[in-house]
Amino acid sequence: MTYYEEVMKLMDEIWETQFGIIKEAAGIFADKVRADKLIHVMGSGHSHMIAEELFVRAGGLANVNAWLDFNLIPTAGARKTCKLERLEGLAKIIWEEQKIDTDDVLVIISNSGRNSVPVETALLAKERGICTIGITSMKHTKMTESRHSSGKRLYEVVDLVIDTCVPHGDGLLHFNGVQGGPASTLAGVFIVNSIVAEALSILNEAGYELSVYGSQNVDGYCNEDYYRRFKNRITHL
C-alpha cells in the first residue's frame, strides 16, 4: 500500500466512526458562536500545528483563541519541548496567561494523550467546569501509561473524545519493522476543519450571520472588524 492509499483509508475510518462525535463538537462550536464565547484550542509538540490550523484561518471561525506557547513548539528546541510537555505545573502557568471564561470551550489535542501538559490542562478545565473536547489516538493512548501523577490520560478527563484513528506509533507504513508516513497531523487537521465546517453549516441553516475570516491574499477582503472585536480577548491576535 502507498502512503496515499493508507491516508485515504484513515480518512474513511475517521468519517465512518467519528462523524457523530464531530457533529456533536460542531454543535458546541455553533453554540459558542451564538453566545459570543470563545473556542480555545491547544496542543504541544507537533499537535500545536493542529491548534494553529484553527487560528485566524481563511474560512475559519473568528472566535478561536489558540494557546501558542513558545515552550511547547518544536522551534523552541525539539528536545527541550519534549521535556517541557512532560513537566507538571507548566500547564497552570500557560493557563494563567489566557482569558478563558467558564462558558467557553477548550479543545485539547494530543495524539498520545499521555503527557502532563495536555492532561493537566484538561484537569484544570474540569475543576472550573469548562467544557473540554479531546482529540487523541485511542489506538495509541490505550497502549501507553500516563506521564501525569494523576495516572490519567487525556481521554479519561475530557468531556468529549474524538479519535484520530491513527495507529500506535503514528506511522501508516512499515519498512522492515520501521514505521514511516506519520498521520496524526493530517488526521487532526481533517477533524478540526470538519468540526468547523459542520458548525458553519448549523449556523448557516439557522440564518445566523457567519463570523469567518477571509483570505488576506484576496484583494478587497478585510478582517479588521474581527481583529477589533476580539483583540482584547484573544491572546495572540
Where are these regions (language model features)?
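Short active-site oxyanion
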Residues: 36-39
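A short, well-structured juxtamembrane/interface segment
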Residues: 17-32
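Glycine-rich phosphate-binding loops that contact phosphosugars or nucleotide phosphates
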Residues: 41-196
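Conserved, well-structured ligand/cofactor-binding cores
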Residues: 4, 88, 92, 231-237
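C-terminal functional extensions of proteins
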Residues: 170-175, 179-237
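Generic N-terminal amphipathic, Lys/Arg-enriched alpha-helix
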Residues: 1-17
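Short, surface-exposed alpha-helical recognition segments that flank or form part
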Residues: 16-20, 82-85
